[in-house]
Structures are given as structure tokens and as C-alpha cells.
Amino acid sequence: MNLSIQDELQLFSEELCRHLTPSFLEELAKKLGFVKRKRKFSGSELATIFIWISQRTASDSLVRLCSQLHAATGTLMSPEGLNKRFDKKAVEFLKYIFSTLWKSKLCKTSAISSTALTHFQRIRILDATIFQIPKHLASIYPGSGGCAQTAGIKIQLEYDLHSGQFLNFQVGPGKNNDKTFGTECLDTLRPGDLCIRDLGYFSLEDLDQMDQRGAYYISRLKLNHTVYIKNPSPEYFRNGTVKKQSQYIQVDLEHIMNHLKPGQTYEIKEAYIGKNQKLFTRVIIYRLTEKQIQERRKKQAYTESKKGITFSEKSKRLTGINIYVSNTPEGIVPMEQIHDFYSLRWQIEIIFKTWKSLFQIHHWQNIKQERLECHVYGRLIAIFICSSTMFKMRKLLLQKNKRELSEYKAIGMIQDHVSLLYQAIQRNTQDLTKILIRLFDLLQKNGRKSHRYERKTIFDIMGVVYEYNGFGKQKKAA
């Protein structure tokens, strides 16, 4: 059934309001014990401060927060009284709201149609962002080590590129291990999912599990792993048994690198990774351009100086190539498209960029733990509201106009309307729908993605049919 733009936004409004109306928040605050008797500062007021009216709840003074609260709700609080309300129950309250929101149906109907969707149920992108916090919280949130961070918070996110749906989420200490979280994410795998993983999450065991569960993967290969091919002429013992050490031949990656031109791709279709339990997989080698090599060397030098990490001589020699492993069928993702598909992972970097540049999740003063945690979960709720709205608008803009929405532009414009969204939610879903229709009109006019440099966009790589003004023609990804 094809719904109108208004009908789709009405359904979206109803789902959003279900989690954020004042009456729902009041009941939730009582249920979780944040409010035990009638007070002038309720769950709704707490949500107002941390979700809606202030970007800088961890850095503005308490006097300023009291002023902003009074301007928005008429509630009069002293700085000391307000600070007392930032307690463990307040953290639990905001954490619960965020958890129910990202597990809700807000993004379930936001998936875009694409060639990739016919082959892969979901395209799962996983990454983490980390930021420093006050040093006195180092025992609770130890940082990532080295000379980079004493205390830090790491946020892990896995989401579906088709719909924007959050699949797995974790807020924890900066030192938390990426690989451990990557393994935990396997619990939500479905057959037909495509998982795109970077080196921080690399695990042969995880890749093998994905394959066994009917899911697909594209991952960078860590250079401390050896690539083998089957030996066509192995040695045998007299009794006819194959000599184990002669079953496989090690691939000389450096030799392959030296024979590839910049931008060229080479594939080993039947390769084996690992010394003992060997993973059977495709191995794709992409020769970086000179510009990409210079950027990588610069990044390596920065990592060595700032984090105290020393790259092996082998890693430095193989700087000129990216090595990917994948179990995707060659007919669906040929070797020439592996690098492009892997680059879809960088979409999550755009999301993390908005968290810091637009939502200022990493801004803080020397404050207590509970206030910082309220700030983090409040910002995450605001982020999810804006990002889920963006993904809904992305689908509607494609559906109506066959245009590609700029994620970064759109989230900024939606954030500019947060105060209007807040006011509408205090009233009813009809008013919220009207604001969302206004937003759609704005994004339709000013939110389209620029194609000035003729670079492949996410729509091109995923095979989304859309139109753009570059040459006044329709553009479809291969």
C-alpha cells in the first residue's frame, strides 16, 4: 500500500509521541523511581533539559540550566536543587528512554529500495567513537591508554544502512575492546545480512560464524595474518597421506602489490586465512593511489607518536595496498566493487561527526558522574530523534522526487527545528505531523546531496535509482 507523504509522517509522529509525551514520561518516572511523590521537577522537566532545550548540559553552568528550564516550562529551581536531581535514578530514566527509542519501530519503514537490498537483507555498519571526560572519572571510565586518554567514554554502534535502524549499541569505558563487542553483535545476525567490518573488529572466528549463519561479510584483513592457496602438487607419505605442511602455499602479498598499478584490483578467488583453523574466503587486493598512500603514512606517523603504537616492518612495506576478505558471491559483488562496498562503512563516520559537531556530546566541564551520564543519554536521545527523522525524510525524498538527501545537511536542518518538535509533542501528533511536513518541504528544497565532484555516493554504490541535476539525466549505480 502506497501511503501519502502526510500519512507516512502521521504514522511516524504517532510512534515518536508514544515514547515522548509528557504523560508517558511522568508515568515512566514513577515506574523507575525518579519521582516518588508530586514534585515541581518531574520526569518531563528532566527530559526537557537534557533532550530538548540545551546542547551544553555538561558544560553550561547550573544557573544557566535553571534559566533555560524556567524559560521552557515555567519551573523555578535553585542551582543546588537542580544538581541534586541529577542522580542515578535520573540516569536510569534517560537511559531507559533511549533504549526503548532505538529498539522501537521508528526506522522500520524507512528502508530505501536498492539493488543491494535484493541481495542483502541489511547492510550492517559497525564502528565506535570515543571522547575524553573529566580525569576524576578514570576509575569508572578508564580511557584507551597510551598518552591519548586518562578517562574516556566509548560508544559502539551498529546500524543498518538501508533503514537507519540501530541494531546494537553500547556506552562504556574508553578502554572497552572493539572485538569483544563485535562478537556480541553476532547474536542479532539474520541470514542475508551483509556485515562490513574494519580492522578493529577483525576476527577469523566471527567471519566464520557469519558464513555459517548464512550472512555475508566484507572486512579488511589484518596484515599479521597469512594468506594461503591450496597446493596443486602436495607431497605425500608412502602410505598415500598428504604431508600437512605441503597442503598450502603462502601467497607473497608484497610481490602482488609491486605488480599492481594505482587503483588496480586483484583477486584470489579461493584463498585460506589463518595458520591452524583456516578460513576459506575470497581475498581482494586493492592498490592505493599515491594520494591515499601519503594519507595512510601520515596517519601511521600520528598513531605511532600519539598512541605509542609501533607498526611492524611488514605493515609499513604493505602500506600501498588494502587487503579485503569476503564471502559475497562474485556475481553479486565483483572484485572491482569490493572497495566501493567497503567504503560504505565511512557513512558511520558522518553520523559520528554530527554527534560532536552538531550535538556537542563531547563537551563537558569538571562535573559529577551522574550529570555527565544524563548529558550523554540526553544527547543520544536527541541524536536518535534527529537521525531517525532524517532516514524517514531520505526515503520520502527518494520516493517522491527520486533525489538523494545529504545526511549531514539534513540532520543539521532537523536539529534547527528541535524546539518546534518539542512544542508540538507537548500538544498532539497532528501538530507534530505539520512540523514534519514543513521540514520535508525544506529538505526537498535545500537538503539534496551535492554531486559537484562526480564521486560515487552511497546511492550509487547500493544501486539506488535516482535523479540529479549534474547533467539533467537519470543516474543509476551499477
UniProtKB/Swiss-Prot annotation:
Superkingdom of the organism of origin: Bacteria
Keywords: DNA recombination, DNA-binding, Transposable element, Transposition
GO molecular function, one term: transposase activity
Xref: SUPFAM superfamilies: Ribonuclease H-like (SSF53098)
GO biological process: DNA transposition
InterPro entries, per the entry: RNaseH-like_sf (IPR012337), Transpos_IS4 (IPR047952), Transposase_11 (IPR002559)
Matching Gene3D superfamilies: Transposase Inhibitor Protein From Tn5, Chain A, domain 1 (3.90.350.10)
Family: Belongs to the transposase 11 family.
Function noted in UniProt: Involved in the transposition of the insertion sequence.
Name of the protein in its database record: Transposase for insertion sequence element IS231B
Organism: Bacillus thuringiensis subsp. berliner
Native organism taxonomy: Bacteria, Bacillati, Bacillota, Bacilli, Bacillales
